[in-house]
Design a protein with these regions (language model features):
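Aromatic- and acidic-residue-enriched carbohydrate-binding clefts of CAZyme catalytic domains
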Residues: 1, 15-68
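Conserved, mostly hydrophobic/aromatic
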Residues: 8, 62, 73, 106
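Active-site-proximal loop/turn and secondary-structure-junction residues that shape catalytic pockets
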Residues: 11-15, 47, 77-79, 112
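Active-site-proximal helices and loops of the catalytic beta/alpha 8
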Residues: 28, 35, 75-129
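Glycine- and acidic
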Residues: 41, 71-77
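Aromatic/hydrophobic pocket-lining residues that form the small-molecule binding cavity
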Residues: 11, 52-55, 84, 88
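Short, well-ordered coil/turn segments that N-cap beta-strands
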Residues: 2-3, 8, 67-69, 100-104
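Generic structural signal for well-ordered alpha-helices
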Residues: 7, 59, 63, 85-92
Length: 129
């Protein structure tokens, strides 16, 4: 038909109000990072495994169960993760596996647009003499 569905997924924050996850474990949140919207999720500190597992399962779920055409990752500059495999890389890997033979779109919002981390997704420029 020519119409694709891309879901906006937000793994960088839960919101400043109504977040009750600390009642289950304070380790779900980072002890060193803070986002623009409140507490950051724990992707790279001690006991980060449950948070990482949840996010990766969520990525697989949307693509495998609903056959979405892609995911748009909200405000990736607020995903703080110094792991050997950062959560965004792991999510991209899992998304491709969940999609199987289907082509999918993975879009990473990054603000400000001139942020130097955006260079990681650009092709190297060829210098002409």
């Amino acid at each position: 038909v020519g119409l694709g569905v891309i879901l906006d997924v937000v793994y960088n924050h839960l919101g400043p109000e109504g977040n009750n996850l600390k009642a289950f474990s304070a380790d779900y949140f980072s002890h060193q990072y803070h986002s623009e919207w409140g507490e950051s999720l724990n992707f790279d500190e001690e006991n980060a495994a449950p948070v990482r597992a949840f996010v990766l399962a969520n990525v697989r779920y949307w693509l495998a169960e609903f056959h979405l055409d892609g995911l748009r990752f909200d405000a990736t500059q607020q995903l703080f993760d110094a792991s050997p495999e950062p959560i965004l890389s792991a999510a991209a890997r899992e998304a491709r596996v969940a999609a199987g033979d289907r082509g999918i779109f993975l879009v990473a919002e990054n603000e400000p647009l001139l942020d130097l981390s955006a260079r990681l997704t650009q092709r190297p420029r060829v210098q002409h003499r």
